């Protein structure tokens, strides 16, 4: 069987994560297919609506996803991985993923708390999967919104089979139990603001791998926010201790 295409989007501001994924992905059963997006496109499309998720109203991800599903069908490729770039990748991804393909699921999502997270997707190249994502796109055209929120809404009408990954083996940084050995971690942020978001993701990544070789790819204007984020964590911890005493 030919390697499974593993697509992820990245832009210059996220080169830090792009280089990490390139160096970390060791499974020969996958073929990495990085999709570089001009930084100007992200600058134009993201953080458009104050007070909303920074992906609100952006079609970048869903349009690329649909394009790659069409391409997979044309090439008789049974499955694709379509993911974000801000990941911690450890050995054993394919063996952990294979069971979902053996069970012939149409779609497999990350589970983040009570909802589906679309940052790491295993997708069967099929018409019903394409129809599902087209439904989400149509919903976004009709009323501007967040693709992930619409994915959770549209799943209720999906006629195929779907499930979620084991939520500790394929985990999110805000739902990991801090003890299970994971193979994928989606590094999330608290949405404190554009610069803080990146700083928080870098800080969280540094808890799991040596990031020093990759700090050369971090923009200089982000560095002060990393230190500030650590200060906020320490402040929050002290406040929590004080509240517990009182």
For each feature predicted by the language model, list its residue ranges:
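Short beta-strand/turn micro-motifs composed of small residues
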Residues: 7-10, 109, 186
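Alpha-helical elements of Rossmann-like donor-binding domains used by nucleotide-donor carbohydrate transfer enzymes
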Residues: 20, 64-67, 96, 135, ...
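Catalytic core and acceptor-binding pocket of nucleotide-sugar-dependent glycosyltransferases
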Residues: 130-244
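A generic structural motif
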Residues: 32-41, 109-110, 145-149, 164-169
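GT-A fold catalytic core of metal-dependent nucleotide-sugar glycosyltransferases
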Residues: 57-115, 120-130
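Conserved strand-to-helix beginnings and helix N-cap segments that scaffold or border functional pockets
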Residues: 18-19, 93-94, 148, 196
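A short acidic, often aromatic-flanked loop/helix-cap motif at beta-alpha or helix-coil junctions
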Residues: 39-49, 115-116, 169-175, 192-193
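N-terminal anchoring/stem segment of glycosyltransferases
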Residues: 1-78, 125-127, 146, 204, ...
